[in-house]
Amino acid sequence: MDAMKYHDLRDFLTLLEQQGELKRITLPVDPHLEITEIADRTLRAGGPALLFESPKGYAMPVLCNLFGTPKRVAMGMGQDDVSALREVGKLLAFLKEPEPPKGFRDLFDKLPQFKQVLNMPTKRLRGAPCQQKIASGDDVDLTRLPVMTCWPDDAAPLITWGLTVTRGPHKERQNLGIYRQQLIGKNKLIMRWLSHRGGALDFQEWLAARPGERFPVSVALGADPATILGAVTPVPDTLSEYAFAGLLRGTKTEVVKCLSNDLEVPASAEIILEGYIEPGEMAPEGPYGDHTGYYNEVDNFPVFTVTHITQREDAIYHSTYTGRPPDEPAVLGVALNEVFVPILQKQFPEIVDFYLPPEGCSYRLAVVTMKKQYAGHAKRVMMGVWSFLRQFMYTKFVIVCDDDVNARDWNDVIWAITTRMDPARDTVLVENTPIDYLDFASPVSGLGSKMGLDATNKWPGETQREWGRPIVKDPEVTARIDAIWDELAIFK
């Protein structure tokens, strides 16, 4: 897995521009709704990343659609194309459950993986580009950032690509997560993290261990792509996101200690927000248009008070929008799908392919194809998908098909469902399971049901009837017709 070399976001933008993957917009455009409209049209057309150099009312440029195509996601992960992301998945599968070499030849085969591990430790700097300019106290003013308002009924401007850095009271390793943050004042944001996410868990542990004490938080905007993508990739719990970013980039992740707390942030990030969450300080968040294509309901979340803003000279504000797919998170989902496959295959070798259709909000429906080996096998795989990786705990529907079905072709999948399923026998319903807070279709917020569809051929024990034989063309006839096809001139 040879990494494409770039040091920070600016290096990456130079690389994109050289390849025609970045467009500079010099015309003044408003971060209030207008940037979303332009970015949405561009993404749907498979267009470039956009750097808005003159956002109306602001001196700071806005970067959008950075990961607007699977190719750019792959480039951000240091790869030439999406197919190479399977190698990233294989590396993660290896790191999740490393196996010692079985001999010299196996050691030689695994040597590239062992060499990559050398890039895992972070490199701590004394000073960093992200601290070239410092604002603190009354000089902190979040309204100077060109924070986008994406949809007409959004409650307020929303930070969308903030890389939130936290650490629990009993942990050495930090957690990196991406949580949206509503702007509610010059130095106030609402931190919308769900209770199972790493940042929220760190906060709950802090409240239990240090009741009444302020919880330190830092947020990085415009980190290098490998670090951003490390925060949204299924990294094993034993591996930090910074370490994984080093593997992707091929060089150690450079970090620097914050000015007001002990958290370490990406040294090359464009902007850093430092501050704290006061225990008990909450505020109503939303509504916001989100990746489901709907506005979500209002709910209370902790308030993040910003005490320091540090940034690079001529900083760039990195942003995105979320809406009904396709949007940038959906594109990320398509690319990261290739990372998931080898991880699942290591645990379940019978899996041939795994697909999260973007139109299913990238995680709410999964199609699995497998080499079925015994009666009930499909149901075992369903349960495995729901339980093996926490990324799939919110997947509402799992469709399991045989390996003669293309998981990424709805024509194939629908054919399998309608010809190989009996609804009563082959549907599995599981009640009272964790469900995405944003899923308003569930009867209770955060709790709902799941459905598994066994669209495989049925084995003895699963049916008492003779099973249908698929129609297969005669290969000799096919070859004869191939030989005379042009002569027939049917389409000429």
From Swiss-Prot:
One Pfam family recorded for the sequence: UbiD_C
Binding site for prenylated FMN: I178, Y179, R180, R192, W193, L194, R197, G198
Annotated source species: Salmonella paratyphi A (strain ATCC 9150 / SARB42)
Enzyme class: lyase
Complexes and interactors: Homohexamer.
Binding positions (Mn(2+)): N175, E241
Job description of the protein: Catalyzes the decarboxylation of 3-octaprenyl-4-hydroxy benzoate to 2-octaprenylphenol, an intermediate step in ubiquinone biosynthesis.
Residues forming the catalytic site: D290 (proton donor)
Gene Ontology molecular function terms on file: 3-octaprenyl-4-hydroxybenzoate carboxy-lyase activity; metal ion binding
Compartments where found: Cell membrane
Keyword match Ribonucleoprotein: no
Protein name as annotated: 3-octaprenyl-4-hydroxybenzoate carboxy-lyase
KW Manganese (keyword) present: yes
This enzyme's EC code(s): 4.1.1.98
